[in-house]
Every structure is written in C-alpha cells, then in structure tokens.
A protein has these predicted regions:
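C-terminal edge-of-domain segments
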Residues: 77-107
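N-proximal, solvent-exposed amphipathic alpha-helical segments enriched in charged/polar residues
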Residues: 1-32
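Conserved short beta-strand edge segments in small beta-sheet-based binding/regulatory domains
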Residues: 33, 69-79
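Short amphipathic alpha-helices in soluble, non-transmembrane regions
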Residues: 58-67
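Short, surface-exposed beta-strand/loop "edge" segments at domain boundaries and coil↔beta transitions
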Residues: 51-58, 92-98
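Ser/Thr- (and often Asn-) enriched beta-sheet segments in non-cytosolic proteins
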Residues: 30, 44-48, 75, 84-90
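Short glycine-rich, basic-tinged beta-strand/loop micro-motifs
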Residues: 27-55
Length: 108
C-alpha cells in the first residue's frame, strides 16, 4: 500500500502557498496545480505569466526564489499568453515499509 510522504507533502504545500501569493499579487498571472494522486509520483504547481513580463516587487521575487529552490525540477514553457514555469516535487509516495516508490532522479 502506498502512503503520501509527509516531507514531500510539506514541500508541495509550501510551493502551493508561495505560488498562491504570487497569483494574488501579480495581475493576469494564472495559477495551475496538479496535486498528489496515487497514479503519479509527482505533484506540481505552475504559474503562467503574460508577456511582456511585469515588473516584480521584492515580495514576489522572494516567493519566486523560494519556488525555484524548494522544488525538484522546474520546467519552462512558452505559451500563447506568455511564459509558464512548472515547479515539481518528486517522490510523493512511500510504501508501507517506508521505501519511496521511485528512485531518486540521479539514479534513474
């Protein structure tokens, strides 16, 4: 049986909160999320910024800096509206014996 890894869930929650702060503070930003689910080993939040990119104040820069440092991977995509950053937390699940369901990225 798989259980959610509390450490990974804490990291995902922190990502959601930081992304939510940016979503509230920056006009026209779109927040998307893919919460943990048994069928996936990852969970992610994404922020789509319209271009040209808005001038970001220090609070927003600090939240973005946290997002980049707290996730396992960041994917950047060009969209019709602008640019989208997807921040992902890996290895969201553990088995009953405490083993993670996926190997660390450097082993795969």
């Amino acid at each position: 049986m798989k259980m959610i890894d509390p450490t990974a869930m804490s990291r995902f929650t922190a990502l959601r909160e930081a992304a939510g702060k940016i979503d509230r503070l920056v006009p026209h930003v779109r927040l998307m999320e893919q919460p943990p689910h048994e069928s996936r080993d990852t969970a992610s939040v994404a922020l789509e910024f319209p271009t040209p990119l808005v001038v970001l104040n220090s609070t927003i820069r600090q939240a973005l800096s946290f997002l980049f440092s707290a996730c396992d991977t960041v994917q950047t995509d060009k969209t019709e509206r602008g640019i989208c950053f997807t921040f992902t937390v890996s290895r969201m699940w553990i088995t009953e014996d405490g083993e993670q369901t996926a190997p660390p990225p450097f082993l795969s």
